[in-house]
Design a protein with these regions (language model features):
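Generic marker of "main functional regions" within proteins
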Residues: 25-27, 155, 185-188, 197-201
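Acidic, low-complexity segments
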Residues: 138-140, 180-186, 192-194
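Solenoidal tandem-repeat scaffolds enriched in leucines and small polar residues
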Residues: 188-215
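A short, hydrophobic secondary-structure junction motif
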Residues: 174-184, 214-215
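Long, intrinsically disordered, low-complexity, charged/polar and glycine-rich segments
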Residues: 1-174, 180
Length: 215
């Protein structure tokens, strides 16, 4: 078929490459540090996460906790975010456990390293810092996801007045490189950063309706 235009990898060839880790944020983002109610990973890394014993709970002065704030540094979001990964033949899901490690809840045999997943400072405007998640597959290959902002997808919040402000949060870590077991052979991926051209602003409009009686 001489009239058919070939793809970038050749005629009748398809290149299936890439992959990503995507996140469904539950409550506050796990990796965002806030003055109150940091995410789970941020609280663990900052040493604010404490597992109380039964004796601790019995001694907790609830009536003073709000007024005098005896325990201000123990506030954090307990609900872990849900991470889904999909690359090549591999797919699965994991969360961050109470020790700050990744725990697979679907898809077995994967080792997930969060040591280079950065804790982000709270911001509603600034791009996130470098953040990397590493996954070792059952066949021994090491996959790197994320890196600088070109390998990250993140959302800038639209914070209308009178609502609780949301921070900038990473939504996806894109596959950035692959290494074999020997780490002598590998491949790297590069991405071009771009910002969304169209921006939509959320606003609130309140109307009060009723009847008025005149006597």
């Amino acid at each position: 078929k001489p009239g058919r235009r070939p793809s970038v990898v050749g005629n009748n060839w398809i290149l299936n490459v890439g992959g990503a880790i995507t996140r469904n944020v539950v409550g506050n983002p796990d990796d965002v540090r806030q003055e109150q109610k940091s995410g789970l990973l941020a609280a663990i890394r900052d040493g604010k996460f404490k597992q109380y014993s039964k004796e601790d709970l019995l001694k907790l002065k609830i009536f003073n906790a709000t007024e005098d704030r005896l325990y201000p540094d123990t506030e954090y979001d307990m609900a872990p975010d849900i991470f889904d990964f999909n690359f090549g033949p591999h797919k699965g899901r994991f969360i961050i456990d109470n020790s700050g490690n990744a725990k697979c809840i679907s898809g077995g045999g994967y080792r997930i390293d969060l040591s280079e997943m950065s804790v982000q400072d709270y911001s509603t405007t600034n791009a996130p810092k470098r953040s990397v998640i590493k996954i070792t597959t059952p066949d021994g290959y090491l996959y790197y996801f994320g890196g600088d902002v070109s390998c990250l997808e993140y959302s800038l919040p639209n914070n209308p007045g009178r609502l609780r402000s949301r921070p900038v949060q990473i939504t996806s870590w894109y596959l950035s490189s692959i290494q074999d077991e020997t780490k002598n052979n590998g491949i790297s991926f590069s991405y071009q950063s771009c910002l969304q051209k169209n921006k939509y602003h959320l606003f609130m409009n309140s109307n009060v309706t009723g009847t008025r009686s005149v006597s």
